[in-house]
Amino acid sequence: MSTTVIMHTSEGDITINLFDDQAPETVANFVGLATGEKTWTDPMTGEKRNDPFYDGLTFHRIIKDFMIQGGCPLGTGTGGPGYDFDDEIVPELKFDHPYLLAMANAGLRRGMDGKIHGTNGSQFFITTVPTPWLDGHHTIFGEVADDESKAVVDKLESVPTDRSDRPMEPAGIISVEVVK
């Protein structure tokens, strides 16, 4: 059984079907952050928190004919939940159509243990066109479920941005509701 979430945004609701079977750790992380069941570290205070992570955050990066990106607690693209985890790349899941939900990351990094690891945390993006150059680099863990939700993604993608791809007017996530 796959998990369904409704992302309530400033432009309307986006229903997303998550790929529990293909990306179980990523789905568990996203759902845990959305509900507050997963502990995260506030980047401003350093305090551990267990409240819904995504509530009130923004889509801090919007690139027309590419994607909308959110999930940064600082609103800059540099913040996260205070931890990271590895990719769950499934070769059968490809960026060959729009409206896919995937983890944003900073690529592979060498950790303190000397091993290479992934840099997934809380940031995600929803594609608005096929993006095959991303295959194998980002964990795909869901898909926008219906035409009404796709229209909301399209509205968000159309928000005016500055030269750094930051929205010139707020484009926000009100909350993420897990409906299972």
Locate the predicted segments by residue.
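Cyclophilin-like peptidyl-prolyl cis-trans isomerases
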Residues: M1-K180
